[in-house]
């Protein structure tokens, strides 16, 4: 498994606008990558950049008091049970299928059977927090890294993908 670095840290929010204000205006971080899957409800995300890492700000919009909708939405359920805050840590990997195989071989419970679509055109897969000491971790393979993930070795020489 080749972990390239921390891709982002996920923050579950009940009010995305409030977290954008905190991370953008108050902390002075660059806000980018706003996505809204459905303007009438569903997941909204934005990213706040610090160095080479992002905070992924996530809000599930569900009708007030709709317990069924809350139970069916990961972020809404998390916020209802624990309140807003740290949700996950995402590790950038060179090859998500390899990372999933290696994690399973190491005895980690990979939730996803196959990679699923993530934000910014990425592929993602989650590891169950019960197998990681209570921390939700997910792998991220980004389309912009696929061509460059194996381009240079530690000595600067070209390295071919496996």
Language model feature labels by segment:
Residues 52-54, 59-80:
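A contiguous binding-surface segment within folded domains or other stable secondary-structure elements
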Residues 43, 50-52, 81-86:
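Short connector loops at helix/strand junctions that flank enzyme active sites
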Residues 1-2, 18-21, 25-26, 30, ...:
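Intrinsic disorder/low-complexity detector
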Residues 1-43, 48:
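Long, hydrophobic N-terminal alpha-helical segment
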Residues 7-10, 90, 140:
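Residues embedded in well-ordered beta-strands within globular domains across many folds
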Residues 2, 13-20, 31, 46-49, 56, 69-162:
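Vicinal oxygen chelate
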């Amino acid at each position: 498994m080749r972990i390239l670095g921390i891709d982002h840290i996920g923050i579950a929010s009940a009010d995305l606008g409030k977290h954008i204000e905190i991370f953008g205006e108050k902390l002075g971080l660059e806000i980018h990558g706003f996505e809204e899957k459905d303007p009438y409800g569903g997941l909204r995300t934005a990213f706040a950049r610090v160095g080479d890492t992002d905070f992924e700000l996530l809000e599930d919009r569900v009708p007030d008091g709709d317990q069924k909708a809350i139970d069916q939405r990961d972020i809404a359920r998390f916020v209802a049970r624990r309140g807003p805050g740290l949700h996950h840590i995402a590790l950038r990997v060179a090859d998500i299928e390899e990372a999933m195989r290696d994690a399973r071989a190491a005895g980690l419970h990979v939730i996803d059977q196959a990679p699923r679509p993530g934000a910014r055109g990425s592929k993602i897969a989650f590891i169950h927090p019960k197998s990681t000491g209570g921390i939700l971790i997910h792998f991220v393979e980004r389309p912009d890294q696929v061509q460059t993930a194996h381009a240079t070795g530690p000595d600067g020489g070209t390295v071919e993908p496996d």
